[in-house]
Swiss-Prot record:
It catalyses: S-ubiquitinyl-[E1 ubiquitin-activating enzyme]-L-cysteine + [E2 ubiquitin-conjugating enzyme]-L-cysteine = [E1 ubiquitin-activating enzyme]-L-cysteine + S-ubiquitinyl-[E2 ubiquitin-conjugating enzyme]-L-cysteine. Its main location: cytoplasm. SUPFAM superfamilies: UBC-like (SSF54495). This is Ubiquitin-conjugating enzyme E2 2. It comes from Eremothecium gossypii (strain ATCC 10895 / CBS 109.51 / FGSC 9923 / NRRL Y-1056). The gene is UBC2. It is found in: Cytoplasm; Nucleus. Residues 152-170 have a biased composition (Acidic residues). One of its GO terms (biological process) is DNA-templated transcription termination. One of its GO terms (molecular function) is single-stranded DNA binding.
Length: 170
């Protein structure tokens, strides 16, 4: 069924395929255009540099008049990310407008890596370390980056059929 939300999401998908902003990618699930997997690469010159952070975006039929529900699937240590992966970002709540699309949502989240807002913390520990103990904050973030790589490698291994193990002629 074609609805305004679904048509808009297909336009968002076309934009992501043809002109995705640097460091972000996203696409709908093959069987559900209302649910998207996304990835943000940690920006250069930040503690998150080269991390591969996965997100889930869930839209309803009110999109783009209502923001999607967005959360990190990857472990994230950040002042503006709750332990459950939900993100404290004004455009996902009270400052949402229908002009935002998937690309702008992801670039806004990516900008939090450059410029966390410890004044409005979702993770008090991360906010405190960011403000008062920057080296400890950076250490924790870098551990999260390494975990993101391990998760990617695990996902790659899970996707392998390991057929060549059965072909050994020892």
């Amino acid at each position: 069924m074609s609805t305004p939300a679904r048509r808009r999401l297909m336009r968002d998908f076309k934009r992501m395929k043809e002109d995705a902003p640097p460091g972000v990618s996203a696409s709908p699930l093959p069987d559900n255009v209302m649910v998207w997997n996304a990835m943000i690469i940690g920006p250069a010159d930040t503690p998150y540099e080269d991390g591969t952070f996965r997100l889930l975006l869930e839209f309803d039929e009110e999109y783009p008049n209502k923001p999607p529900h967005v959360k990190f699937l990857s472990e994230m240590f950040h002042p503006n990310v709750y332990a459950n992966g939900e993100i404290c970002l004004d455009i996902l709540q009270n400052r949402w407008t229908p002009t935002y699309d998937v690309a702008s949502i992801l670039t806004s989240i990516q900008s939090l890596f450059n410029d966390p807002n410890p004044a409005s913390p979702a993770n008090v520990e991360a906010a405190t370390l960011f403000k008062d103990h920057k080296s400890q904050y950076v250490k924790r973030v870098k551990e999260t980056v390494e975990k993101s790589w391990e998760d990617d490698l695990k996902d790659m291994d899970d996707g392998d059929d390991d057929d060549d193990d059965d072909d050994d002629d020892d």
